[in-house]
Amino acid sequence: MKRSLDQHPISKRPNVVVNEYAGAIVSDNAIDETASPEGFFEKYVVARKPVKITAKDASALCPINIARFRVDKILETLPAARKRVLQVEKKHALGFGSGKKRESMTFEEIVERLAQGDESLYLTTQYEEHDYDELNESDGESNEEGEAGDIGKEEADEASEDEEEDELEEETTENEGDDDASKKMLESNSNGDDDPSDASSPDPSIDLENLHDDFDDVADEESFVIPEHQLTQDEVDYRVSSLLQAPLTELYKDKSFPLVPENFRPLIPQQINLWMGACSNKRKDAPDLFSPSIESLGRYVPSGNSSGLHHDHADNLYVLVQGRKRFTLFSPQDAEALRTVGELQKIYPNGLIDYKTNQRARFWRPMRADGAMIGEWARWMIEKEDFKQYSKEQLEKMIENDVPFAEKSNSESNWDPPSFSTVPPLLAHLSEISDERHRESLQNYANKHFPGFLNLHKLEVWLEPGDMLYLPTGWFHEVTSFAEDSASAGAHVALNWWFVPPTGGRDRPYPDEYWKKDYEKTLAAIEYKRAESA
């Protein structure tokens, strides 16, 4: 059964959230700006503080030649990608960001349509096919009109709602006891404890004596193209395309293209992405502002196209190539007031936000502060036979508990990803509403359904081509895209680097070698591909 998030009883239940965030907060409406690399890592990365980087006045800070990635040049820069079929996001609920509607077309066609000002498309991260299935599994029939109602509708009587709530409570209670070992491990990651509990016997259906990577199912020693890292050709290709997301994949051949820009070393990159869309600068027709709801407001903003308010699970360096962008930022300290789709479990000192695995985050897997999934980390520890901190049985229990809710439940969900706020973006931009009656109506709606939101401190950051924004993990952001000042309509283009979120300083940014060893495999894959293409 679907129901409106305005009315959903889960969002009103008391929830004990552990908020250990220890980084920068918003004290006024001005963001730091810098054009200097001096002390950058300590001032911003370690301090978990967003900063606008005005690289057009300090080219040493900009990792790319932005002219090469503008709409009129990008096909020359990425010639091998011309005919590559990519997934583009279609506008949904008056904006982008949810990934609910996607369409396949060649990169060349995407560029041509955006150059012509087609506002209905947005090129974002390229997910694997099974990831699309996870995002869209419960969407049912597509809503051809693109209404925001896919978020949830009131369709049933009160008795049905009470029954569903009771079922969720039973499922949650059943799962609580199984999570103790993983929770202890999460606590250990942030406060130094090293004594997990509940290391009971694992599920006999899980062959924990024969743990291995997915690629090992088809691999033997003869199939490894990089034997020292036990990488097959498939895994080599996968690692390169996962880091350099299509259509950027061919940049592995370009040794001048930085996988980690100078000021962010020694962080480890997770993904490098291309973002492309188009927008008109004229004001749009507004929905009914006298009777606002999540469904009616969707991702409407008076002008531009909105991403929706959300946070990431990685540190972000965002480089604007073309167009204009407005980032509206909220600190991880305010996560509870931002009413995420997912049920908050913990906010780590570095800002990373972890969720409870339930029907509101059906594919969620518990994370450490550095973004490592607990189950995958436990497999790694067993593979290298490291039982100093945790016994083998305790690690096996962590793996057993690492099961997505979707595998335990047939519950229906049409909600956004857990990291999205249910607060409509318009409520962050009420100053743009000129009609006082409309503004008062929206204020009343916000105070009723999102109490405290209008009182939160926020940062507003405008980016022009050549500007960059560093955003630590967990910082909520709503991004509104515009055409450039000189155009009534046009394309907007950006590149971004996502980094594994650090938990320490430059000398020891991560708690162990989990990510370092994984990145060594990716670098080996890139070197292999370079030699292969030479």
Give short role names for the model-derived ranges.
Residues 2-468, 476-534:
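N-terminal accessory scaffold of Fe(II)-dependent oxygenases
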